[in-house]
Structures are given as C-alpha cells and as structure tokens.
C-alpha cells in the first residue's frame, strides 16, 4: 500500500474551472466509446434486480445507453440474448462463478449466441474463480467483451486484465445499500474515488467506477480520476420504469431498493452484506438520464473543453474527508 497516497472520496473533491470555449453546453459531446460500441453518456444503471429488468434494458439499448442485465433470473438469459439479437440491439448480461455458470457459457456457444458484453459480477472479484471464468468465456465466446469485478486494488486490475478481461469494475462496498464496509471492515467505502484513481493508474483497459456516486457531479469526478464508465444504483432507483416493488405510505409512493447481497435478494439471512431502503418514486428514468447528460455537458464547459477528454486534465482541490461518503447511518 502506498502510504503517501491521497485518500479522498467524491464529496472531498472540487474541480477547478478553466476558460469556457463553447457558446452553449449543448455543443458538448458527452458520448463515450466503451468496447465495440459508443454510448450517449458514460453511465450504466447498476445490474441489480431493483434497478433493471428486460423492458428497461430494451429501452436503454434503443436509446443508445449502456446497460448490464442482472443475473438473478438465470433461466431467462439465453432467451434474453436471443431476443436482443433479434431486435438488432446490444446484448449485455451478467454471470456469476458457480459451476452452472460455466455450463451456461458453453450453452451460449453451442447455440451460437455471443452476447456483446458479459459482466462477471461478484462482490470480491479478485479471485481465482473469476480468472477461470474470464478464460472460460474467452475460450468459448472470444468476441464477447468481458467486464470483470468487483475489485479495489491495482494488483487485482492487472491480474484480471492479464487473464483477458476487457474492462474491470472498481468498488468494494461503497454503495448506498451495501453493508460490506460495516459488516466486514473491508472495502473502498469512504475512499472510492481515490481507489478509482489508484486502479486507473495501473489499468491498460477501461475501468467502471461502481458505487458511491450520490450526485451527477460525481460522474465528472469519476472521469477526472480515470474511469471510462460509471455504474450507478441509488440515483436510478425509484423511477417509474425501475422494477423495485412500490409501497404506499401515508399517500406517498415509495419504491424498495436493496443490495445484491441483501437477505431480500438472497431470500436467506446468511452472508448478508446488503440492506433495503425505501426511496420516493421520482418520475421517468429518461428525464434523469437527460439531466445527467446536461450536467455533464455543463461540467465539460467548466473544464474548458468540448468532450469528456477535457475532464481528465482539470486541476482539483481536496476540501475535506468523511468516511461515510455523505450517508447518515
């Protein structure tokens, strides 16, 4: 560990403006090339069961947003890939690392179905079994773009890249409904942005910053410190299109949002590292995505550029430190 490393999180950083070179923020290009495709913004909704389902995946793909389908209905995945291919849309799925997941990859190959993106999605992604799965996918589906995670160190990023991962997902427990940092004492909660920076310096391939993003400005900060894409859960939870269960309390509508390792997800109280919260329902997801794009356009105009590249060069100051990243526990 680098003892001289600066430790900070999103709320601790303010970026310093440069001279603006655009007449209007509408001139700013927020698109990002990630793997073989280009997307409107460098943002992907979290691959969680309370955030994404098949209809939303279709909508996102149709509107040039990146998505990753969750892995909690494994029996649906083959048909989902087939359906997306039929529609002429990108197919992007998640897999775990249990034995039957290795069989599933072979079944995809046997059916001549190659998803555009496959995300190996486990809480502690710096593991031999993840390396085995990367190599397995690359053997059977060599044209799939493989995202592996989650990790929190440069060593992990390098090993997964060397195994064949095309991108890595950085973040151990910084999410709003993730309890890993409190239950285990491990993770990047409270220093997620510094972890992104640390990992990005070692990476040769793209990084997805996953977790801890609480405001739209945090997307720009992630890009500044080396992320190509940001995975976001809580800001997307509670929309009309998101699949979390709706609850009515005193005439107000709320939606359930829970972590992928919560008892609500697992249906069991063993090895729980996630919790459930209720969020007010907040309209259409398209409006939130548009607002994210507009805020990113403004951020680029402050950076003095015309596209996302300009964010990577701005100066910044560290204003304070807070281990809980703005969440009151």
Swiss-Prot record:
Instruction: Drop me one GO molecular function for this one.
Output: GMP reductase activity
Record's GO cellular component terms:
cytosol; GMP reductase complex
Spell out the reaction equation it catalyses: IMP + NH4(+) + NADP(+) = GMP + NADPH + 2 H(+)
Can you tell which superkingdom this protein's organism belongs to? Bacteria
Question: What SUPFAM superfamilies has UniProt attached to this entry?
Answer: Inosine monophosphate dehydrogenase (IMPDH)
Q: Does the keyword Oxidoreductase apply?
A: yes
What's in the keyword line of the UniProt record? Answer: NADP, Oxidoreductase
Q: Which residues cross the membrane?
A: none
Instruction: Indicate the residues that form the catalytic site.
Output: 178 (thioimidate intermediate)
SMART domains the UniProt entry points to: IMPDH
The question of whether Oxidoreductase is a record keyword is answered with yes
Record-linked InterPro entries: Aldolase_TIM, GMP_reductase, GuaC_type_2, IMP_DH/GMP_Rdtase_CS, IMP_DH_GMPRt
UniProt lists the family membership as follows: Belongs to the IMPDH/GMPR family. GuaC type 2 subfamily.
Q: What is the documented function of this protein?
A: Catalyzes the irreversible NADPH-dependent deamination of GMP to IMP. It functions in the conversion of nucleobase, nucleoside and nucleotide derivatives of G to A nucleotides, and in maintaining the intracellular balance of A and G nucleotides.
Q: What is this protein called?
A: GMP reductase
The gene that this protein is the product of is guaC
């Amino acid at each position: 560990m680098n003892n001289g490393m600066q430790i900070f999180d999103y709320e601790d950083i303010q970026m310093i403006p440069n001279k603006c070179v655009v007449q209007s923020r509408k001139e700013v290009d927020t698109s990002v090339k990630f793997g073989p495709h280009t997307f409107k913004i460098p943002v992907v909704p979290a691959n969680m069961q309370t955030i994404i389902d098949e209809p939303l995946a279709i909508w996102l793909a149709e509107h040039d947003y990146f998505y990753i389908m969750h892995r909690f209905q494994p029996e649906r995945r083959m048909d989902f890939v087939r359906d997306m291919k039929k529609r002429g849309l990108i197919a992007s799925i998640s897999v775990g690392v249990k034995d039957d997941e290795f069989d599933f990859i072979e079944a995809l190959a046997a059916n001549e179905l190659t998803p555009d993106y496959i995300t190996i999605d486990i809480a502690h992604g710096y593991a031999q079994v993840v390396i085995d799965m990367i190599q397995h996918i690359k053997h059977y589906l060599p044209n799939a773009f493989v995202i592996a995670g989650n990790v929190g160190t440069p060593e992990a990023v390098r090993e997964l890249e060397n195994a064949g991962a095309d991108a890595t997902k950085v973040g151990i427990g910084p999410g709003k409904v993730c309890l890993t940092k409190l239950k285990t004492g491990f993770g990047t909660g409270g220093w997620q942005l510094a972890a992104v920076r640390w990992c990005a310096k070692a990476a040769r391939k793209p990084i997805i910053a996953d977790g801890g993003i609480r405001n739209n400005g945090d997307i720009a900060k992630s890009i500044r410190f080396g992320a190509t894409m940001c995975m976001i859960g809580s800001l997307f939870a509670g929309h009309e299109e998101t699949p979390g269960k709706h609850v009515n309390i005193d005439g107000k509508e709320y939606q359930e949002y829970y972590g992928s390792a919560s008892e609500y997800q697992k249906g069991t109280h063993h090895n729980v590292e996630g919790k459930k919260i209720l969020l007010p329902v907040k309209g259409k997801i398209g409006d939130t995505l548009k607002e994210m794009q507009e805020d990113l356009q403004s951020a680029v105009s402050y950076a003095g550029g015309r596209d996302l590249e300009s964010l990577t060069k701005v100066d910044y100051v560290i204003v304070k430190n807070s281990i809980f990243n703005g969440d009151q526990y």
